[in-house]
Amino acid sequence: MLKAPRFWYQPRSLLGGILSPFSFLYQIIVRIRRGLYAVGLKKISKFPVPIVIVGNITVGGSGKTPFVIWLANELKNRGFRPGVVSRGYGGKANRFPQTVTENSDPLQVGDEAVLLMKKIDCPMVVCRDRGAAVKHLLRNFQCDVVIGDDGLQHYSLGRDLEIALLDDRHLGNGRCLPAGPLREPKSRLNTVDFVVPKQLRPNEIYQLKNPAKKIDFNELKELTVHAVAGIGNPGYFFKQLETLGANVIAHPFRDHYFYRSEDFNFDDDHLIILTEKDAIKCKQFDDERLFCFSVDAVVPDQFQNDFFRLISNIILRKQAQREGI
């Protein structure tokens, strides 16, 4: 079981200070790498449809998956034809790019990809090479906008809009790896189009074995539960359950962990509540104690207004360019 070092989220710490020189070196490398793309010394893949990148500048969960689900479905509801590309973290398929379906194996294409596909109404492709994923998507589907899931640092993929998400831990101690949780200097947020705070709303709790069997949120006030999370920020999940009144026995696992039945061999009969991403990998277990806690992203109205105005203008501009107007 792995989790982010505590000193990443402390303003001052001995270990953070010791690692600061390495963070400075890391920042230099990041700036040089990004600069090479900016001046054209490294190739950027460009496409005839808008590319919207959703990501963050911190290590760990920032609510990207629920947000991408919301964004893809909202685009579809407003008449767009979206598609999603992702790296497919944890997937071990021998062939990429690969189109994700509802029946895809999380072991092959990654847990997040399977969760996304079960909750969005649009095509999705996974590949380590994001540009190859977009090419495959556009070759096989009639998409007019592409969402890049967790691609903020993949500069080789051209983009028209960038959305950075921030979770409840914000930027931690403000330092880059390894002294802090930042993948890029915090000044990077000044270059993105939108910074959106993570906000998740509880949706429902249902049994994995029989999804029709649900637990009312009010029932949690009387329950002691095992909370199991193999996500980037398990603490947020545990706090959500505690806020709903549950007495939580926390079990954090490393991100993208693939569970075995013995991982749930607890010495009692308390219910076991999992995140949606974890539940995707546990449906094969014949265990009536396993329940899934599903959530929805809550997105600010101002962002929605600004984003859809911008994306509509970008689509019109790109159409005009293709038609030579």
Curated annotation (Swiss-Prot):
GO terms for biological process: lipid A biosynthetic process; lipopolysaccharide core region biosynthetic process. Pfam families: LpxK (PF02606). The lineage of its organism: Bacteria, Pseudomonadati, Pseudomonadota, Gammaproteobacteria, Legionellales. This is Tetraacyldisaccharide 4'-kinase. Transfers the gamma-phosphate of ATP to the 4'-position of a tetraacyldisaccharide 1-phosphate intermediate (termed DS-1-P) to form tetraacyldisaccharide 1,4'-bis-phosphate (lipid IVA). InterPro entries: LpxK, P-loop_NTPase. One of its GO terms (cellular component) is plasma membrane. Keywords: ATP-binding, Kinase, Lipid A biosynthesis, Lipid biosynthesis, Lipid metabolism, Nucleotide-binding, Transferase. The keyword Oxidoreductase does not apply. It catalyses: a lipid A disaccharide + ATP = a lipid IVA + ADP + H(+). GO terms for molecular function: ATP binding; tetraacyldisaccharide 4'-kinase activity. Belongs to the LpxK family. ATP binds at T58, V59, G60, G61, S62, G63, K64, T65. Pathway: Glycolipid biosynthesis; lipid IV(A) biosynthesis; lipid IV(A) from (3R)-3-hydroxytetradecanoyl-[acyl-carrier-protein] and UDP-N-acetyl-alpha-D-glucosamine: step 6/6. It comes from Coxiella burnetii (strain RSA 493 / Nine Mile phase I). Its EC number is 2.7.1.130.
